Regions:
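Serine-dependent protease modules
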Residues: 1-204
């Protein structure tokens, strides 16, 4: 399949996620304010189950999911695991287009990868492509040591929770890190062309 074919195939399975969290202000007057966040997710069932990153939805009071066609739904968290940085959301919808789940254990370095997500929280359904740069890369994300797929596909804040697909359009990873992560030697990974994804076999 061409990258164009894969993009057309997988875009309906990727959603944009926006969150609102009530944050208490530690001032003498008390009070609180709403903090907004953004991320991405991947539909894994026709009836509204969506996989994303735990850090995207952690602590959120309100979660809104926007489908590729612009329809918005309120989502609830049905499960999350901060160690693997995976969360599952549920929206009340039917007839959705779930991603085809691939096998991340069969990936090879140099294979084509296509990342689809919502970079910067405003550019929903953005498609970038690259290759598998490395496998089983040890990266610390939000204090957790993880073995991740490294990809050269462009990853930006807001891509977290989006899909990393192979050349056949199968979901092989959940994008979860770019800038602000550190390698196991402690350097910050702000370099371009350096994105990471949770292998789908770990996430599922």
């Amino acid at each position: 399949l061409s990258i164009q074919d894969v993009a057309a195939l997988v875009q309906p399975s990727v959603v944009a996620i926006t969150t609102e969290q009530m944050v208490s202000t530690n001032t003498w007057f008390g009070g609180s304010y709403v903090q907004s966040g953004a991320g991405s997710g991947v539909i894994i069932s026709q009836d509204g189950y969506i996989v994303t990153c735990a850090h995207v939805v952690s602590g959120a009071n309100n979660i809104t999911v926007q489908l590729a066609d612009g329809t918005e739904y309120t989502a609830t968290v049905v499960g999350q695991d901060s160690t693997s940085d995976v969360a599952v959301l549920k929206i009340e919808a039917t007839g959705l287009t779930p991603a085809v789940i691939g096998d991340s254990d069969s990936l090879a370095v140099g294979e084509t990868t296509i990342a689809v997500g919502n970079p910067l929280g405003t550019l929903s359904n953005t498609v970038t492509n690259g290759i598998v740069s490395a496998l089983n890369r040890e990266v610390t994300v939000q204090g957790n040591d993880m073995n991740l797929i490294q990809t050269s596909a462009s990853i930006s804040p807001g891509n977290s929770g989006g899909g990393l697909f192979n050349g056949q359009g199968e979901l092989i990873g959940i994008v979860n890190a770019k800038s602000g992560s550190t390698t196991n030697t402690g350097e910050a990974t702000n370099a371009e062309g350096l994105g990471f994804a949770i292998p789908i076999n770990t996430a599922m």
